[in-house]
A protein has these predicted regions:
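Short, acidic, metal-binding catalytic loop of nucleotide-sugar glycosyltransferases
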Residues: 38-44
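Generic detector of multi-pass transmembrane helix bundles and their immediately adjacent loops
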Residues: 300-388
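Short catalytic helix/loop segments, enriched in acidic residues and glycine
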Residues: 22-35
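Core alpha-helical transmembrane segments of integral membrane proteins
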Residues: 216-298
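Conserved alpha/beta core of the MobA/IspD/sugar-nucleotide pyrophosphorylase nucleotidyltransferase superfamily
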Residues: 136-249
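Short phosphate-binding loop-to-helix
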Residues: 52-106
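Conserved core of the sugar-phosphate nucleotidyltransferase
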Residues: 86-88, 98-172, 287-308, 318-320, ...
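N-terminal nucleotide-binding beta1-loop-alpha1 segment
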Residues: 1-19, 23, 375-382
Length: 388
């Protein structure tokens, strides 16, 4: 059964701009958007964001989340929370400005009953809220409906998150302790400024994601590791994934020009660079906890690469190779490659590298024939290899 998530977006950041913590830039989006996506990935089916004032930045964040199919609502008072919060499922509570690794969010998402994520009292946990003499709240809690509505029935102007946590402590909620290494390495932090947000985002990028999108062919062995490094750098520079993807499309289109001018190897190199940029855009989406696109935007750079392969070959074999490679590309992107291992998948980048080597040796015609045989073998692996 799903659960609700309650986020907070009311505390000011420590920056001179005076903006909200929740609106700090984090992993290509606002911090509260990242929290919402974490909760959804852990199993939340609706998001409530407690606010004191609705700012344009918060409204835009809600619009972006809604566009991705996430049910989200801004809540300004306790009356609205009592009316809208579900009474039959638990709620995942996240502190204002808290960034916790996805593993901890998933753990509390799978927990049952009142549960607190805590850290032992130490210098590393000093920014966190103290809950007793020996521990502090690490910014994440699972709250039962009884505790939530018992607290909401109280009258007064108070901090909902902290009041819920204190009520959970008084009722003896189960505690999950965060290792001190997570605090030191940024996997559990309370972000108060943009500088802190950037540092924690670097830690998130270094740790990677637990559900990285699978790839086959040369993408798996070469492009994914390179995109991991490039994605971390682009995230630090706050470059949106959409801009990188558009750049990949533009570069792939430009690469067709030298191919038409008979500078085939130069065009192939540009196409490989375009495919690497597209993979980097996917990496940025993963870091932001967004699902990589599965529609036409995902297929423009590799599709143009296949067009380049046809233009360079100029034969029916080249057309057949591009068509079969296109089918394999869709199967790889949509995870319909069955039990085929990554090295069994012939992707557009794999074909380009094979043809680059053949072209450098003056054996371009033979390269197309070998690539066609490899495509047939790859299709056979997808169709015939026994599924687990």
């Amino acid at each position: 059964m799903g659960f609700a998530a309650i986020l907070s977006a009311s505390r000011a950041s420590a920056d001179s701009s005076g903006g909200l913590r929740a609106c700090l830039h984090f992993a290509g989006q606002t911090l509260v958007e990242y929290q919402a996506r974490q909760a959804v990935r852990a199993g939340a089916d609706r998001i409530f964001i407690m606010v004191s004032v609705i700012t344009p930045a918060l409204s835009q964040a809600v619009d972006r989340l809604s566009a991705d199919g996430i049910a989200v609502a801004l809540v300004r008072d306790m009356v609205s929370m009592v009316r809208d919060a579900p009474r039959d499922v638990d709620a995942l509570l996240m502190a204002d400005g808290a960034i916790v690794s996805q593993a901890h969010v998933d753990s509390l998402g799978a927990a049952e009953g009142d549960t607190l994520l805590v850290a032992d009292d130490s210098r590393a946990s000093a920014p966190l809220e103290r809950i007793d003499a020996g521990q502090r709240w690490a910014g994440l809690a699972r709250i039962s409906p009884a505790l939530l509505f018992g607290t909401l029935d109280m009258i007064g102007d108070w901090d909902l998150a902290l009041t819920l946590v204190r009520s959970a402590v008084q009722k003896g909620a189960r505690r999950v302790t965060v290792p001190e290494a997570d605090l030191l390495e940024g996997r559990a932090a309370l972000v108060e400024s943009q500088q802190q947000a950037d540092l924690v985002a670097q830690a998130v990028a270094s740790a990677g994601t637990t559900r990285a999108h699978a790839r086959g062919g040369i993408e798996h062995y070469l492009f994914v590791p390179l995109a991991r490094s490039a994605g971390s750098m682009l995230m630090r520079l706050q470059v949106p994934a959409l801009q990188v993807r558009i750049g990949a499309m533009a570069l792939a289109a430009i690469a067709l020009v030298p191919i038409e001018l008979a500078w085939v190897l130069t065009g192939f190199c540009l196409l490989l660079l375009a495919l690497l940029l597209a993979e980097s855009a996917d990496r940025l989406d993963e870091l932001a906890l967004r699902r990589p696109p599965q529609g036409w935007t995902a297929f423009v750079p590799p599709g143009l690469a296949l067009v380049g392969i046809v233009l360079a070959g100029g034969t029916t074999t080249a057309v057949d190779l591009a068509l079969l490679s296109g089918v394999l590309m869709v199967a790889d992107r949509w995870r319909r490659s069955g039990a085929a291992a990554p090295w069994m998948m012939l992707t557009p980048a794999s074909v380009l590298i094979l043809l680059l080597v053949a072209g450098a040796l003056g054996l371009m015609g033979e390269g197309y024939r070998v690539a066609m045989l490899a495509a047939i073998a790859s299709a056979a692996a997808v169709i015939l290899r026994p599924r687990a």
